[in-house]
């Protein structure tokens, strides 16, 4: 009976010692969190292994992540994976479609993103571009004559229109002279003419008798304007003036109209501020609807594919610039010892328990063997 009791005691003590030893060893990985001193003497094994080597652990974790986990090769394979690309394209299409079908106005979107100043900047930049283009256009065309500046088609249209213009002027002149207003104007012109000549009017009056001078002159003027020769004469005059104009410099226009007046007139006609305001008052959906299918169906897949291709080609430099090892090191260094302990235990809790149980099993086995040895030695 004593023999079996001795074996039970040695086995139990061995199991307790083995299990507790392993449990203590595991605890000493993390505890104590800080060094313990007796006077000036630091107690051995304080602090625990992980608190003591936390900085080195942070460095090694950073290297492990960069060298073995987030490697350029691994990320490159992921980026070139067809399933991943298809999934990313579909996700991007859904998200982009949500944005371009938004019922909010562009102005509301800009306010939401704190970009209210964009409207003012857009107006300023558009007006600046238009102004620069006008100045460049005028600077170039001011070096030309009208013949060089105007397109050949304009020359043809003007020259073909001259006879019609001459005919139009004469017809309008005849129509005006036949009216009462025209007759009154002609009469006044005749009176003014003879008033400056004194006795000449009396001499003409003797020849005409009681007939009004305007009644004699009006039909003759109308007859003159209606003759073919008059039309040819006016056509020739207009043609000569047109030829003179073609030889003159466009720059002469500046003496009549200043550049700034031209610029302001064009800007006023374009109404940049009103146009931009009207554009921003539209909803995102209204603006994007005409190109929605193109954006979602073509632009997004193409952009994602090109982006992934660029990312694959530059993944090494991207990871280098991100300095992942340093990021991991800094993050781990900021962990408190308690948090680091909880993190490790949450991952290895079951395994560490098994190590404790294994220590108890080995200790119990050794105690049992010791009991057998004592039995045989007796």
From Swiss-Prot:
Membrane topology type? Multi-pass membrane protein
Keywords (alphabetical) are: Cell membrane, Membrane, Transmembrane, Transmembrane helix
Q: Any transmembrane segments, and where?
A: 1-21, 357-377
Which InterPro entries did the record assign?
Answer: DUF445, UCP032178
Q: Cellular location of this protein? A: Cell membrane
Q: Does the keyword Cytoplasm apply?
A: no
Which GO cellular component terms are attached?
Answer: plasma membrane
Which Pfam families does this entry report, sorted A to Z? Answer: DUF445
Q: Which family does it belong to?
A: Belongs to the UPF0754 family.
Protein name as it appears in the record = UPF0754 membrane protein BcerKBAB4_0766
């Amino acid at each position: 009976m004593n023999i079996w009791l001795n074996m039970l005691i040695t086995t139990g003590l061995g199991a307790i010692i083995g299990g507790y030893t392993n449990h203590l060893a595991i605890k000493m990985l993390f505890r104590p969190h800080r060094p313990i001193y007796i006077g000036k003497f630091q107690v051995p094994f304080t602090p625990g292994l992980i608190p003591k080597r936390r900085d080195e652990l942070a460095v090694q974790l950073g290297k492990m992540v960069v060298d073995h986990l987030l490697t350029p090769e691994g990320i490159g394979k992921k980026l070139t994976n067809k399933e991943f690309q298809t999934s990313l394209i579909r996700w991007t299409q859904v998200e982009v479609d949500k944005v371009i079908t938004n019922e909010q106005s562009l102005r509301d979107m800009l306010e939401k993103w704190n970009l209210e100043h964009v409207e003012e900047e857009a107006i300023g930049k558009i007006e600046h571009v238009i102004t620069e283009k006008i100045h460049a256009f005028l600077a170039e065309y001011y070096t030309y004559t009208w013949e060089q500046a105007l397109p050949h088609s304009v020359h043809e249209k003007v020259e073909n229109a001259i006879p019609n213009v001459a005919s139009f002027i004469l017809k309008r002149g005849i129509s005006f002279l036949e009216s009462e207003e025209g007759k009154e104007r002609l009469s006044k012109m005749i009176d003014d003419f003879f008033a400056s000549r004194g006795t000449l009017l009396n001499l003409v009056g003797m020849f005409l008798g009681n007939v009004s001078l305007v009644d004699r002159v009006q039909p003759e003027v109308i007859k003159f304007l209606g003759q073919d020769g008059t039309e040819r004469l006016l056509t020739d005059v207009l043609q000569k003036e047109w030829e003179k104009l073609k030889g003159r410099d466009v720059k002469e226009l500046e003496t009549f109209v200043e550049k700034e007046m031209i610029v302001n007139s064009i800007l006023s006609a374009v109404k940049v501020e009103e146009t931009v305001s009207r554009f921003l008052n539209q909803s995102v959906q209204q603006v994007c609807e005409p190109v929605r299918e193109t954006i979602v169906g073509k632009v997004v897949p193409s952009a994602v594919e090109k982006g992934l291709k660029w990312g694959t080609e530059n993944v090494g430099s991207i990871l280098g610039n991100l300095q992942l090892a340093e990021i991991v090191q800094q993050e781990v260094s900021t962990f408190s010892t308690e948090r680091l302990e909880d993190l490790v235990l949450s991952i290895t809790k079951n395994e560490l328990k098994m190590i404790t149980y294994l220590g108890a099993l080995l200790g119990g086995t050794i105690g049992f063997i010791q009991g057998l040895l004592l039995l045989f030695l007796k």
